[in-house]
């Protein structure tokens, strides 16, 4: 199970390594930063039908133990790349077998979902739909965050308090993280104005660093046609050329 969970994480990190179809809808993944569409079933509603794996993921789970046995010292990321390469070279006739299995299971899944929903009360159905919306928003935010990391967006500036916490947290004498944070917070309150001023200055310096890095980064985004990532205030001021 741990190996399987590791494989999921590597697949998400690698992006489109041969995964052409979304496990949820069977369609191609349109993201500009290719991330594997990982299926998740509803959990809090009880026995909600579980989505079937896509043809590629089914193939991967079959091949992973074989590759692991052949290459026991290889990293999981290397094994996943080998499996992806094997999938790309797989004859279309063999791929169609996996795709046919997926389509059959997807049809059965949709029928099971319909039957499941018929048993729900209006309030339960509303709760399930609310949960689905929240999960979609969470996933959208996660994909956006990963995209910005891949594009090298500068880290936001830290406050004086955050700088102090990062410096003092490990030295705090408490076994729990919550206890450490409480001690650091109390120590911050007891700092003299002069002592706090040093951290305030560091925060100002970090803000200057952030502003300079963001200006450069947004210019790069404008050059590559990603003006959607430029802050609105910058667009209005005309500091960034979108051409």
Curated annotation (Swiss-Prot):
Span of chain positions assigned to the transit peptide in the UniProt entry: 1-42
Any Pfam family hit: HMG_box_2
Tissues and organs where the protein is expressed, per its UniProt entry: The mitochondrial isoform is widely expressed while the nuclear isoform is testis-specific.
DNA-binding region(s), residue ranges: 49-117, 154-218
Modified residues (Phosphothreonine): 121
Biological process (GO), any one: mitochondrial transcription
GO MF annotation terms: chromatin binding; heat shock protein binding; mitochondrial promoter sequence-specific DNA binding; mitochondrial transcription factor activity; transcription coactivator binding
Keyword Mitochondrion attached: yes
Modification Phosphoserine, positions: 54-55, 60, 159, 192
Any one annotated GO CC term: mitochondrion
Modification N6-succinyllysine, positions: 66
Record's keyword terms, sorted: Activator, DNA-binding, Mitochondrion, Mitochondrion nucleoid, Nucleus, Phosphoprotein, Repeat, Transcription, Transcription regulation, Transit peptide
Keyword Repeat attached: yes
Site (Intercalates between bases and promotes DNA bending): 57, 181
PTM section of the record: Phosphorylation by PKA within the HMG box 1 impairs DNA binding and promotes degradation by the AAA+ Lon protease.
Knockout or disruption consequences: Embryonic lethal, due to absence of mitochondrial DNA. Mutant embryos die before 10.5 dpc.
Complex formation: Monomer; binds DNA as a monomer. Homodimer. Component of the mitochondrial transcription initiation complex, composed at least of TFB2M, TFAM and POLRMT. In this complex TFAM recruits POLRMT to the promoter whereas TFB2M induces structural changes in POLRMT to enable promoter opening and trapping of the DNA non-template strand. Upon metabolic stress, forms a complex composed of FOXO3, SIRT3, TFAM and POLRMT. Interacts with TFB1M and TFB2M. Interacts with CLPX; this enhances DNA-binding.
Entry text on domains: Binds DNA via its HMG boxes. When bound to the mitochondrial light strand promoter, bends DNA into a U-turn shape, each HMG box bending the DNA by 90 degrees.
Name of the protein: Transcription factor A, mitochondrial
């Amino acid at each position: 199970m741990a190996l399987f969970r590791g494989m999921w994480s590597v697949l998400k990190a690698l992006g489109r390594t041969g995964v052409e179809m979304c496990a949820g809808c069977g369609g191609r993944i349109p993201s500009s930063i290719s991330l594997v569409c990982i299926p998740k079933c509803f959990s809090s509603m009880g026995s909600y039908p579980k989505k079937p794996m896509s043809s590629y993921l089914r193939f991967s789970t079959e091949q992973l133990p074989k590759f692991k046995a052949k290459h026991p010292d290889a990293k999981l990321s290397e094994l996943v790349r080998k499996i992806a390469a094997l999938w790309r070279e797989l004859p279309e006739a063999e791929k169609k077998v996996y795709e046919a299995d997926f389509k059959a299971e997807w049809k059965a899944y949709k029928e099971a979902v319909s039957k499941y929903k018929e048993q729900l009360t209006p309030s339960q159905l509303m709760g399930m739909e609310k949960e689905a919306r929240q999960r979609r928003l969470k996933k959208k935010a996660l994909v956006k965050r990963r995209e910005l990391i891949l594009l090298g967006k500068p880290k936001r500036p830290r406050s004086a308090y955050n700088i102090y916490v990062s410096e003092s947290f490990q030295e705090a004498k408490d076994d729990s993280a919550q206890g450490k944070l409480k001690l650091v917070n109390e120590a911050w309150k007891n700092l003299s104005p002069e002592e706090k001023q040093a951290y305030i200055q560091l925060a100002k310096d970090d803000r200057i660093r952030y502003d300079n890095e963001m200006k450069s980064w947004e210019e790069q985004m404008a050059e590559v046609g990603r003006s959607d990532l430029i802050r609105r205030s910058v667009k209005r001021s005309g500091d960034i050329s979108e051409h």
